[in-house]
Amino acid sequence: MRIAIVGNSGSGKSTLAGQIVAAQNAAAHSIASLDLDTVAWEPGKIAVGRSPEAAAADVAAFCSTHDRWVVEGCYGMLVGHAVAYSPILLFIDPGVEACLANCRNRPWEPHKYASKTDQDEKLEFLLSWVRGYYTRVDDLSLRAHQALFESYRGLKLRLAHHQTTWLDDLAARFQACAVPAKEWTHAAHLVVGLWHVHRYGAAEALDRLRNGIRRLNESHGGVNTTTNGYHETITAMYVQLLAQYLDRCRTDMAIDMRALDLLAGPLAARDVLFTFCSRDRLMSTAARLEWLEPDLAPIDLEATTYRGVSLG
């Protein structure tokens, strides 16, 4: 698992990173964590930045040294160095009021401030800086983070908040046709599918996903035809795979963390379905319109490998 988290100050990056680390530790999977504040600023000096080259070198060293990690921060350039290692990219944007409230309620951060009093004295400056996120054009702005998100070709999700209900929120926005086209990524498809299978079971999930994807495509100005839009066999295959995945998951792990585990594994590979079904068959008009049985292998995670890695 490799995850990079970006967003405004107060968006919940550190909190989400902590939740991920705790969930992985509970599952006996060690994972390293890097707060980019610790490499962006000179140690022991308030608001004295390090050279971009030195900070970038530290990020690269961290990412290359650890197999499993979480990197979080508001520094677009530094997160950009982390995404070179193909992590899951999480962009958190809860809105300015939520960020301001989180900053006001933030506990003392000893790695940034000598005391809680010192931190509180700088609160008004921080709040002003948080408000400026939406209008600035620098490396630490909404504009920079959006550009990073949109240009990244790996697995990515844009979240409305960091709470453990972020997946509920994404599923609700899917059902309301309120997920913008640029945010309806491969990763979003997968975790929304997982949420539906977890909530409704495979059969009802397929019905709801079929209707929801068709409506969302149309809300984006797309069409569902014999050559574009909703694909029945792809959706049905993923529903079966996700149901098997959930059967093998730790039941004491929250569904949002199981979703991140899913994205970190081989089942999230974009071409994984070709392990079960030939390209010509899966990309056919018939497969788009109705269910076609796979022609290469039965849909069985335990019995299937993808590039030498077991899917089970």
Question: What function would you assign to each model-found segment?
Answer:
Residues 93-140:
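A glycine- and Lys/Arg-enriched "phosphate-lid" helix/loop adjacent to the NTP-binding pocket
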Residues 51, 55-97:
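Glycine-rich phosphate-binding loop used to anchor ATP phosphates in small-molecule kinases
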Residues 18-67:
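Conserved substrate/cofactor phosphate-moiety recognition/catalytic segment
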Residues 132-168, 172:
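NTP-dependent small-molecule kinase module
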Residues 231-312:
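A charged, amphipathic interaction segment
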Residues 13:
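Conserved lysine of the Walker
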Residues 167, 176-251:
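Conserved, aromatic- and glycine-enriched, well-ordered alpha/beta core segments
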Residues 9:
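The conserved Walker
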